[in-house]
UniProtKB/Swiss-Prot annotation:
Record's protein name: Leucyl/phenylalanyl-tRNA--protein transferase
Location(s), subcellular: Cytoplasm
EC number in record: 2.3.2.6
Domain of life: Bacteria
Top enzyme class: transferase
Source organism (scientific name): Stutzerimonas stutzeri (strain A1501) (Pseudomonas stutzeri)
Family according to the record: Belongs to the L/F-transferase family.
SUPFAM superfamilies per record: Acyl-CoA N-acyltransferases (Nat)
Cited NCBIfam families: aat
Gene that encodes it: aat
GO biological process, one term: protein catabolic process
Membrane-spanning parts: none
Catalytic reactions of this protein: N-terminal L-lysyl-[protein] + L-leucyl-tRNA(Leu) = N-terminal L-leucyl-L-lysyl-[protein] + tRNA(Leu) + H(+); N-terminal L-arginyl-[protein] + L-leucyl-tRNA(Leu) = N-terminal L-leucyl-L-arginyl-[protein] + tRNA(Leu) + H(+); L-phenylalanyl-tRNA(Phe) + an N-terminal L-alpha-aminoacyl-[protein] = an N-terminal L-phenylalanyl-L-alpha-aminoacyl-[protein] + tRNA(Phe)
Signal peptide: none
Keywords: Acyltransferase, Cytoplasm, Transferase
Length: 226
């Protein structure tokens, strides 16, 4: 039976109670205030819903993650990064990045990054928890991604690209920086060929929960202003 969250209670049901079909649906309802979002990520779940649906919370099993030391970069992409005209920054245009991620996609109808969702993550950015990666070409924002940094973990949310390989360049730059900062794991949530091409792989939900317990409260050397 699916748990419906109460507004005055920030707790989530145990991860092992998530539904098998659809895979990982843990709870419904609640809200997107910062306290609940932070509680969700600490617990091992994340919000995802389409416009017109109730707010849904997910913890899939298995969970797709990328260990920074396992990053794979193709020779063609590495060449583009060396000789291309892209410039990558952090936290310079968070609102614009999340708007880009919410834009229309050729392969999907609608967006799960609704206006309330955008507003919620902008608030987390203002709190110093959510961060963006921007990819620029001739002064124009052509790609980027955003997510949350908590302890030694980064929770990736979405990315977009308006130029060839722009989001890939941003993602690789982020992973290499996270590796320098000593991050242990990047949460990719669900498997895609795109992420798997970089070395992302699936681990049991229980192993993901163990990683949360081990790394969430460890201080990192991250400097997003650099």
């Amino acid at each position: 039976m699916l748990t419906w969250l109460k507004r005055d209670d920030l707790s989530f049901p145990p991860l092992e109670t998530a539904l098998r079909e659809p895979n990982g649906l843990l709870a419904a309802g609640g809200d997107l205030r910062p306290e609940r979002l932070l509680a969700a990520y600490r617990h091992g779940c994340f919000p995802w819903y389409q416009e017109g649906q109730p707010l849904l919370w997910w913890s899939p099993d298995p969970r797709t993650v990328l260990f920074p030391d396992e990053l794979h970069v193709s020779r063609s992409l590495r060449k583009r990064m060396r000789h291309g005209d892209y410039r990558v920054t952090f936290d310079k245009a968070f609102a614009e990045v999340i708007q880009g991620c919410a834009g229309p996609r050729s392969y999907a109808d609608g967006t799960w990054i609704t206006t309330p969702m955008q507003d919620a993550y902008v608030r987390l950015h203002e709190m110093g928890v959510a961060h963006s990666v921007e990819v620029w070409q001739q002064g124009q924002l052509v790609g980027g991604l955003y997510g949350l940094a908590m302890g030694e973990l980064f929770f990736g949310e979405s990315m977009f690209s308006r130029a060839t390989d722009a989001s890939k360049v941003g993602f690789v730059t982020l992973v290499e920086r996270l590796r320098e900062w000593g991050f242990a794991l990047i949460d990719c949530q669900m498997p895609t060929r795109h992420l798997e091409s970089f070395g992302a792989r699936s681990i049991p939900r229980a192993a993901f929960a163990e990683a949360l317990a081990m790394h969430l409260d460890r201080p990192s050397a991250a400097d997003w202003r650099a």
